[in-house]
Amino acid sequence: DETIERVIRRELESRGWTIGTAESATGGLVGRRLTSLPGASATFRGSVVAYASDLKTSILGVPESTIDEHGVVSEATAEAMALGARAVLGVDVAVAVTGSAGPEPLEQPVGTMIVAVATPTTSMVRTLHLPGDRERVRAYAATGALHLVLRAILDS
């Protein structure tokens, strides 16, 4: 049974890389999925759930000017979260998610989720427009994040 989590772990192990997450709207779902397999500690180092904007700044090092200029739910903030997570967690690959999961919109329409991945050689950012209620949007965003992680690893 080849799950996305297994493929990511195999690709990380083959490179001797580690991974970590910086999550906001998904509340730790990406980290949960990456740690769902036994032996996850071989590649997974940790996760920061920075739900509050001040934590994005104080823990992940997202510049306040980025949040002021672009907003919390922006590609610039997501990329800064991923780059900050690489540094703070000491990982080769970091994935970050921010967004508006609902039920009330936050800067962007409900269902707007932004995923960023930073590796030693590249960074990728994608804006997803997802259907459904809050939990479905969060679950879809976690799946989208894992697919972007795999793509970024394979492109590195």
Label every PLM stretch briefly.
Residues 1-156:
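Short alpha-helical segments enriched in small residues
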